[in-house]
Swiss-Prot record:
List of residues that carry N-acetylproline: 3
Native source species: Neurachne tenuifolia
Cofactor: Mg(2+)
Protein name, UniProt field: Ribulose bisphosphate carboxylase large chain
Name of the encoding gene: rbcL
NCBIfam families, alphabetized: PRK04208.1
Lineage of source species: Eukaryota, Viridiplantae, Streptophyta, Embryophyta, Tracheophyta
Alphabetized GO MF terms: magnesium ion binding; monooxygenase activity; ribulose-bisphosphate carboxylase activity
């Protein structure tokens, strides 16, 4: 290159491949309050040092690529690169490490969960130098979280809208999830709401199929809501699933729900996508609709302990993208969920400030500042005998959702709903009187059966039903 055409970028440039750790492993780095921090569970390929593996994660999820490029000289790499600043071995696991990476805030578009995930997990998980990679947790700084609207309304506003306080809310997923006509579906909703539930729900894959088009379902469910409200004097709702094949169609369904005057709609946020979810959440805030979120597809991403992304990360992302409810497992039901881990991400959904607590899987202190909280929904294989444990585990700010545990009642849907409501009221009263739900739960339910034949019948049907399998995802030994 002649002196006339030589540029600053070309001075000192040396083509070739160099170790990631020379640039991206910086154990001396002190994290900034504005950094997004990530904790990755890294399993390197044999022969790859943990420092190189951690640095590769930092590089490939920020500014790096596989070879040196001359355009590095056109920017400030130190300002924009991700940094692997700490590595610790995972106790009890061979060749597995927790690698901590700090990302400068300027790497991310404001108010975009889509962009955040595209950067942090979009490409690096296919990297050949790693046998497996899992994103365990993220620290979202207030500087970034304040660029998001968050939940459309939040816990307190929802309680005020419903005029319901001092207890968990009760819900039911209509079963069978597929195959009912719209009129029969609406009838099931009415019976459950009349029997004592606060909400009924579309299942995640109820969209607009040949046997039940969405508009018909919305109309019959709205009729069920208004009829049940008139009879009970309580505000009722049904999660009308607005998830659709396009964002435009999704919004059309949400607009129709608002025109019907119903209080809440629903979205499958992982299959529907974060861009669609954020748009729907903004519409819901502007138009007074609550937003229920289903996490369909989450276990594809989060169930394996050594690869993927933990649900606590998906939960934080949902709080940022927007939702008033989100499914969070049950601990005691048919779906995966270890108690301490579940309580960790439940706090991350509901609370304003959550301290680091590795015993519950929380890797970073998280400050949400003024962002509203999300109500966790316990759903999946639960019935009246689980009510004391659910009330004790999840507390008042939760939705306890019994699908088969309502519709499977031998006397029908309304008695099934009544059984659940009586069981809940008995547990809340016992707790308020100072009784130990964990120790005395069965006695509390049995005593309530004396005053409720519906509850007694439910207890008899499900007395031997248990789901006793060890969870796959457990807390690391610290």
């Amino acid at each position: 290159m002649s002196p006339q055409t030589e540029t600053k970028a070309s001075v000192g440039f040396k083509a070739g491949v160099k170790d990631y750790k020379l640039t991206y492993y910086t154990p001396e780095y002190e994290t900034k309050d504005t950094d997004i921090l990530a904790a990755f569970r890294v399993t390197p390929q044999p022969g790859v040092p943990p420092e190189e593996a951690g640095a590769a994660v930092a590089a490939e999820s920020s500014t790096g690529t596989w070879t040196t490029v001359w355009t590095d000289g056109l920017t400030s790499l130190d300002r924009y690169k991700g940094r692997c600043y700490h590595i610790e071995p995972v106790p009890g696991e061979e060749d597995q490490y927790i690698c901590y990476v700090a990302y400068p805030l300027d790497l991310f578009e404001e108010g975009s969960v889509t962009n955040m995930f595209t950067s942090i997990v979009g490409n690096v998980f296919g990297f050949k130098a790693l046998r497996a990679l899992r994103l365990e947790d993220l620290r979202i700084p207030p500087t970034y979280s304040k660029t998001f609207q968050g939940p459309p309304h939040g816990i307190q506003v929802e309680r005020d809208k419903l005029n319901k306080y001092g207890r968990p809310l009760l819900g039911c997923t209509i079963k069978p999830k597929l195959g009912l006509s719209a009129k029969n579906y609406g009838r099931a909703c009415y019976e459950c709401l009349r029997g004592g539930l606060d909400f009924t729900k579309d299942d995640e894959n109820v969209n607009s199929q040949p046997f039940m088009r969405w508009r018909d379902r919305f109309v019959f469910c709205a009729e069920a809501i208004y009829k049940a409200q008139a009879e009970t004097g309580e505000i009722k709702g049904h999660y009308l699933n607005a998830t659709a094949g396009t964002c435009e169609e999704m919004m059309k369904r949400a607009i129709f729900a608002r025109e019907l005057g119903v209080p809440i709609v629903m979205h499958d946020y992982l299959t529907g996508g974060f861009t669609a979810n954020t748009s729907l959440a903004m519409y819901c805030r502007d138009n007074g609709l609550l937003l229920h979120i289903h996490r369909a597809m989450h276990a594809v991403i989060d169930r394996q302990k050594n690869h993927g992304m933990h649900f606590r990360v998906l939960a934080k992302a949902l709080r940022m993208s927007g939702g008033d409810h989100v499914h969070a497992g049950t601990v005691v039901g048919k779906l995966e969920g270890e108690r301490e881990i579940t309580l960790g991400f439940v706090d991350l959904l509901r609370d304003d400030f959550i301290e680091k607590d590795r015993s519950r899987g929380v890797f970073f202190t998280q400050d949400w500042v003024s962002m509203p909280g999300v109500i966790p929904v316990a759903s999946g294989g639960i019935h009246v005998w689980h009510m004391p444990a659910l009330t004790e585990i999840f507390g008042d700010d939760s939705v306890l959702q019994f699908g088969g545990g309502t519709l499977g009642h031998p006397w029908g849907n309304a008695p099934g709903a009544a059984a659940n409501r009586v069981a809940l009221e008995a547990c809340v009263q016992a707790r308020n009187e100072g009784r130990d739900l964990a120790r005395e739960g069965n006695e509390i339910i049995k005593a309530a059966c004396k005053w409720s034949p519906e509850l007694a019948a439910a207890c008899e049907v499900w007395k031997a039903i248990k789901f006793e399998f060890a969870p796959v995802d457990t807390v690391d030994k610290v």
